Amino acid sequence: MSGGAAGPAGPTDAAGEVVGAWLPASLAATGPLSGSGRTLRLLVPGLREAAAGQHVDVRLTADDGYQAVRSYSLSDVRASAGGAGRVPEIELAVERLDDGEVSPYLVDAMEVGDPIEVRGPIGGWFRWPPTRFEPGSAVQAVMPDPLGAAPVDAAPVQLIAGGSGVAPLVSMLRVRGALAEGPEFRLLHSVRDPASRWFADELDGYAAAGVAEVTTFFTRAAPEGGGRASGRLTERELLDAALPAERHPVVYVCGTNGFVARVAEWLVAAGHDPTRVRTERFGGL
């Protein structure tokens, strides 16, 4: 498959933003991720600046004209604005699915210089810094800031990821890490084993530099001396490690359908404001 010609403007996303036209892009660089993952750095002329947490649609076109479209989270948006003669650049993090239609090509076959099409960025809700709505606006009337809470764009940030769901949260950490100062960040990452931990060295670096507190829970195999046996993340463990509800954090949860549903339920039951629990999910339990 290859990238085809740009198509008509797309629909609006869930936040009412225009998704935009299909844009021709090309692979500029790639790198391995733990397990069966790969990062893809794409050059996308004409792309509008992306926010951390957003995603894009990608489209592949076969020689017979058949097209396949999939959505992938952005793991790096820092160069998405382009400017000063630079072409806008984004990074995707893609996990290879054995029965997938698009991911095997992206992970195993796509080479530097190969074309692809991109539409987006998409997502007005799952993004950091979050959009701040002015007092008296229609959105604030429906979803006011919790009593005594800092404005949403100044609130502490809790990131919670299951497996490859860490990708859009890494984009948030990269933006936060580039700031001289900013709100407190914490990341909780539930992952099968150390070998499946995406961006491990970078995340450990953020923890060492004080950018974020990082806690990892291994579900299948834990490292020796880690202090916790392997096993599924429990409600008690999550609530003990996460920022407490009384601090009114903005919480971003990304993972499989089942993981996100469980975590969101635990958070709301513990008193977290539902308007500050923001979720992104993909197939699976």
Language-model region placement:
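Active-site-adjacent beta-strand anchor residues
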Residues: L159-G162, V253-C254
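Ferredoxin-reductase
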Residues: P11-I122, R132-F133, V191-D193, F218-R220
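Histidine-anchored nucleotide/phosphate-binding helix
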Residues: V166-A178
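Short, compositionally biased
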Residues: V69-G83, P129-I160
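Low-complexity, intrinsically disordered tandem-repeat tracts enriched in small/polar residues
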Residues: M1-A15
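Reductase modules of NAD(P)H-dependent flavoproteins
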Residues: V18-L23, P183-L285
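Short, conserved phosphate/pyrophosphate- and ester-handling motifs at nucleotide-, phospho-/glycolipid
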Residues: G53, G165, T256
